[in-house]
């Protein structure tokens, strides 16, 4: 063997047989071994979560960011007492904050369980039912498309070409009468 080529007993030059190159699990060639060692394994179960930025993809920017000023506003000329306004602001903000925490504590884990099961079922159905169904449909539709293509080329093309030639000499003259 020389330079990644294989010379047989009769002097013919071939590429190196696949067994001598190794396989994807135990490569013999250094380039493939380096390529595999550079890939980092990323496991979704062991990744760390960010406790500060809990919406890194900004899913709820336009929905959940509701402040006191977004809900309650007093126009000019109809203001309540300043103390009432401050107490209303504090009551609204604290109630929203703690009631959200209470609901999260009571229903957060059960809802996470429900949504985890739902998306697991959805992923399972997509992987094991939807994609194979679409692939089988595409394989089956190829036969129909070939028959349809033959039909179009043998029947429709000559028919429409003949009709086109018949009407190709039709001329329309428009004259405006005064």
Curated annotation (Swiss-Prot):
One of its GO terms (cellular component) is acrosomal membrane. The modification Phosphoserine is found at residues 2, 9, 37. The modification Phosphotyrosine is found at residues 6, 14, 25. This is Caveolin-1. Residues 131-142, 167-178 are annotated as: Interacts with SPRY1, SPRY2, SPRY3 and SPRY4. Phosphorylated at Tyr-14 by ABL1 in response to oxidative stress. InterPro entries: Caveolin, Caveolin_CS. The modification N6-acetyllysine is found at residue 5. It is found in: Golgi apparatus membrane; Cell membrane; Membrane, Caveola; Membrane raft. The lineage of its organism: Eukaryota, Metazoa, Chordata, Craniata, Vertebrata. It is a peripheral membrane protein. It holds the Pfam family Caveolin. Keywords: Acetylation, Cell membrane, Golgi apparatus, Isopeptide bond, Lipoprotein, Membrane, Palmitate, Phosphoprotein, Ubl conjugation. Residues 2-104, 126-178 are cytoplasmic. There is a cross-link at residues 5, 26, 30, 39, 47, 57 (Glycyl lysine isopeptide (Lys-Gly) (interchain with G-Cter in ubiquitin)). Residues 2-94 are annotated as: Required for homooligomerization. Residues 82-94 are annotated as: Interaction with CAVIN3. The modification N-acetylserine is found at residue 2. Belongs to the caveolin family. A lipid is attached at residues 133, 143, 156 (S-palmitoyl cysteine). May act as a scaffolding protein within caveolar membranes. Forms a stable heterooligomeric complex with CAV2 that targets to lipid rafts and drives caveolae formation. Mediates the recruitment of CAVIN proteins (CAVIN1/2/3/4) to the caveolae. Interacts directly with G-protein alpha subunits and can functionally regulate their activity. Involved in the costimulatory signal essential for T-cell receptor (TCR)-mediated T-cell activation. Its binding to DPP4 induces T-cell proliferation and NF-kappa-B activation in a T-cell receptor/CD3-dependent manner. Residues 149-160 are annotated as: Interacts with SPRY1, SPRY2, and SPRY4. Coiled coil: none annotated. PANTHER family: CAVEOLIN (PTHR10844), CAVEOLIN-1 (PTHR10844:SF18).
């Amino acid at each position: 063997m020389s330079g990644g080529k294989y010379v047989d007993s009769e002097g013919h030059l071939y590429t190196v047989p696949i067994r001598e190159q190794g396989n994807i699990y135990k490569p013999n060639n250094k380039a493939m071994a380096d390529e595999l060692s550079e890939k980092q394994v990323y496991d979704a179960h062991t990744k760390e979560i960010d406790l500060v930025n809990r919406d890194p993809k900004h899913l709820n920017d336009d929905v959940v960011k509701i402040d006191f000023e977004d809900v309650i506003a007093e126009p000019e000329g109809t203001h309540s007492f300043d103390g009432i306004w401050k107490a209303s602001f504090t009551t609204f903000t604290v109630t929203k904050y703690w009631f959200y925490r209470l609901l999260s504590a009571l229903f957060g884990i059960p809802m996470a369980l429900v949504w985890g099961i739902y998306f697991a079922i959805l992923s399972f159905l997509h992987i094991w039912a939807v994609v194979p169904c679409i692939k089988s449909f595409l394989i089956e539709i190829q036969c129909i498309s070939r028959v349809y293509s033959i039909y179009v080329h043998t029947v429709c093309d000559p028919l429409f070409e003949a009709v086109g030639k018949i009407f190709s000499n039709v001329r329309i003259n428009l004259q405006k009468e005064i």
